[in-house]
Regions:
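Short glycine-rich anion-binding loops that position phosphate/pyrophosphate groups of nucleotides
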Residues: 48-51, 57, 128, 192-195
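A glycine- and small-aliphatic-rich helix-loop capping segment at beta-alpha/alpha-beta transitions
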Residues: 50-69, 141-142, 203-212
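Active-site-proximal beta-alpha loop/turn segments in soluble metabolic enzymes
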Residues: 85-92, 123-131
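A structural-propensity feature for long, helix-poor, extended segments
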Residues: 77-97
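Contiguous, glycine/small-aliphatic-enriched amphipathic segments in soluble metabolic enzymes
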Residues: 1-47, 103, 108-121, 127, ...
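Conserved small/polar residues in nucleotide/adenosyl-binding loops
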Residues: 226-230
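Short, flexible loop segments at boundaries between secondary-structure elements
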Residues: 72-83, 216-225
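A general structural motif
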Residues: 65-70, 77, 98-114, 208
Length: 230
């Protein structure tokens, strides 16, 4: 039954029943098909499978919510200073402006789901257009789009993380930002290397900090793509 449903779903992507039937012997395909058909409420995977393959299967079987072209992952950090939401920590290696826009929109929705009001900084090594080449340009374009289309959302960038985290320093040097007077609680990183390294560094240096995640954002149905801490 699962093979038939998958082959019909992906018939226009070249899938055949025989290929779909072979895939049902793989735990990721079988487990995600259980969720897709309603035979299971959620699927947890990743401990014994390659993460990149797990992402591929999730997009193929469960799919991305129609209002987005990309999905992402968030980690939540609870510390004495407060609660912080970090994205995208596991999925998109080299996001362009379009991907960063989706990550920002997904983060906004997820932060509100956890009953927090997002105050979002789009991070980079550059501040507010100081560098006109490379990854800061993508972040700058994403911020521009978000500010135009979400006028009530507290979001700004691109900015260095020290300015994001220090309200007084940010307000003194960049008083024009939409974040003036606000404490940032949502950090969107420019790429996977920076986001993944940041949350793992914080976790390693502060044993009193609670780490929650990964939290998948943007898939059609619940699927936890777990990564081994080792």
């Amino acid at each position: 039954r699962y093979a038939r449903i998958l082959s019909e779903k992906r018939a226009r992507q070249g899938a055949t029943y025989e290929e779909a039937n072979d895939k049902m012997f793989e735990r990721n395909y079988f487990g995600m098909m259980m969720v897709e058909t309603g035979d299971a409420d959620a699927f947890i995977t990743g401990l014994y499978t390659k993460y990149s393959n797990t992402i591929k299967v999730a997009k193929e079987v469960i799919g991305i919510q129609p209002q987005y072209k990309h999905f992402g992952t968030m980690h939540i950090l609870n510390s004495k200073k407060g609660t912080y939401f970090l994205a995208d920590t596991l999925i998109n290696r080299h996001p362009n402006a379009e991907t960063l826009i989706d990550i920002a929109k997904l983060s906004e929705h997820t932060v509100r789901f956890f009953n927090h009001t997002p105050v979002m900084a789009m991070l980079s090594y550059s501040n507010f257009g100081a560098d006109t080449e490379g990854s800061p340009v993508s972040v700058h374009e994403a911020v521009e789009y978000m500010q135009q289309n979400y006028p009530d959302l507290a979001i700004d960038g691109e900015m260095q993380v020290n300015f994001a985290m220090d309200r007084k320093m940010r307000d003194a040097k960049y008083p024009f930002t939409r974040l003036k007077g606000k404490d940032v609680n949502t950090l969107v990183f420019p790429n996977l290397s920076s986001a993944n390294s940041a949350y793992k560094l914080l976790q390693a240096m502060n044993t009193e900090m609670e780490l929650i995640g990964p939290i998948q954002m943007g898939l059609n149905k619940p699927c936890l793509l777990y990564t081994s801490p080792s």
